[in-house]
């Protein structure tokens, strides 16, 4: 499994690292602790799963797909990555929206890692024991000097399930990472305004 990782120890220009990911397809800055912010994009095929770590917290943004054949990227890709990084419990699981390529593996993560918070952009079946909360623009929190903020959805009713995606902004040392789910051009434009 290919993993793209960005680890920040000190204030660094994140755009340089993100550009490298886009240009070269792989980035491994450093896996040594202590880091202030570590963002790992996991290869889950068509889909998305991002693991965000601070020194004392862990968040998973989307869990990739599951298939009728029984293959589940939450179980087969994300869970082993979390375990190999010493993560046995999640502070938060964010499921941007209900499309299988983002939400399919989430139930396996809920079962294995018992997230303290489950944030969703729209209703997602994560098992009978899972209580979810809808992400909303304006929700914000700090972990270990790193700020997390939901920028979308707001109170406006969106017609497309893609446009109901949770959009998460992560800020550290004056730099920003945006996890947009599957928002479309119209929502992107509104976020830029």
Q: Where are the regions a protein language model picked out?
A:
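Short, exposed "boundary/linker" segments that immediately precede the start
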Residues: 1-6
